[in-house]
A protein has these predicted regions:
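Short beta-strand elements that form the blades of beta-propeller/WD-repeat-like
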Residues: 103-113, 163-172, 246-255
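Contiguous hydrophobic, core-forming segments of folded domains
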Residues: 148-195
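Short, solvent-exposed coil/turn segments at beta-strand boundaries
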Residues: 98-103, 131-132, 158-165, 189-192, ...
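Bacterial N-terminal signal peptides
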Residues: 10-21
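Acidic, small-residue rich beta-repeat scaffolds with periodic aromatic anchors
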Residues: 22-78, 175-292
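Short N-terminal edge-element motif at the start of the domain
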Residues: 82-160
């Protein structure tokens, strides 16, 4: 089984060797013939451009001169005819092998500078391929909203098939004692990058005010009420890679934890990507906010 929590695949190194051409000196210096002097000089071999240099050039061209591979830079984001200040940063990047070539996956996260609690952040996704001395865009998905408080959550790169890669986003909402975390899969499809579905990654009400400090000395009725209503459940996402040659691997979600009344939960859900809609048919129970 291949879990998305495992460290990303080792970054591929692409290096080139510059070839140097030289002439052996003649035994005696002899003036070159006039015809030879008129010949055009042989073209120099193309200089190797590193992957990081290509990435930096793409970021600068897309986001401006302040964009960088490491750390934040200030920019702007226009959505619904409103332009707001935003702090951008690269939140996931990895080269991947696809067939007999390679691609560069890139996610750029944006956090609103003055985001209110209800405001989401944004993440922009790119699949790039080498083109000349830079990168060309094979597919992109921009303007996607995630998270709260102006923060977009986190992005990671996943392997979902033999040579099929995409992105996983985890974001959440916290309030009134509840934690509601979700995970979204963004995968390349026939029409480019697309959001294929959204499910919970974790839910709990551990910080509910009236139950946060309940202990053995608490009123029995209060303690029982809190125990009845308390829940904490994880939804771990991974891909079934038992057939490693399969183009797209089945998706597994393992639901574990405690539901209301202290009942233990442990069950596995299995899904396949619909080839027509390019989505996973997740049930509402995997998007719930509390006990079933």
């Amino acid at each position: 089984m291949s879990a998305v929590s495992l460290k990303p695949l080792a970054v591929l190194a692409f290096a080139g060797t510059t070839l140097l051409a030289g002439l052996q000196p003649a035994a005696e210096p002899v003036p070159a013939p006039q015809a030879d002097a008129a010949k055009p000089a042989a073209s120099e071999p193309a200089a190797h451009v590193s992957r990081t240099a290509r990435l930096q050039a793409f970021l600068t061209g897309r986001y401006g001169k302040d964009a960088k591979l490491s750390g934040q830079w200030r920019g702007s984001w226009t959505q619904d005819d409103e332009t707001r200040a935003i702090d951008w940063q690269v939140c996931a990047e990895q080269p991947v092998v696809t067939g007999d070539s390679w691609q560069q996956l890139l996610a750029v996260c944006g956090a609103l500078v003055d985001g209110a609690h209800i405001d989401p952040g944004t993440i922009e996704f790119f699949v790039l391929q080498p083109k000349g001395d830079g990168f060309g865009v094979t597919s992109e998905l921009t303007g996607e909203r995630f998270g709260s408080g102006g923060q977009p959550g986190t992005a990671s790169i996943i392997r979902a098939g033999s040579d099929f890669y995409g992105f996983r986003v985890e974001d959440g909402w916290f309030g009134q004692g509840f934690s509601l975390l979700s995970q979204t899969l963004v995968l390349p499809g026939p029409k480019g990058l697309t959001s294929t579905g959204n499910v919970r990654s974790h839910i709990d009400n551990d910080a509910q005010y009236e139950c946060e400090n309940v202990d053995a000395a608490a009123d029995p009725d209060t303690a029982e009420d809190c125990r009845t209503r308390r829940f904490s459940i994880d939804f771990a996402l991974r891909f079934d890679d038992s057939d490693r040659s399969a183009r797209i691997w089945p998706l597994l979600i393992e639901e574990t934890g405690n539901t209301c009344g202290g009942k233990r939960v442990r069950q596995e859900h299995r899904f396949t990507l619909d080839p027509k809609s390019w989505t996973y048919s997740f049930p509402e129970s995997l998007r719930r906010e509390g006990c079933e």
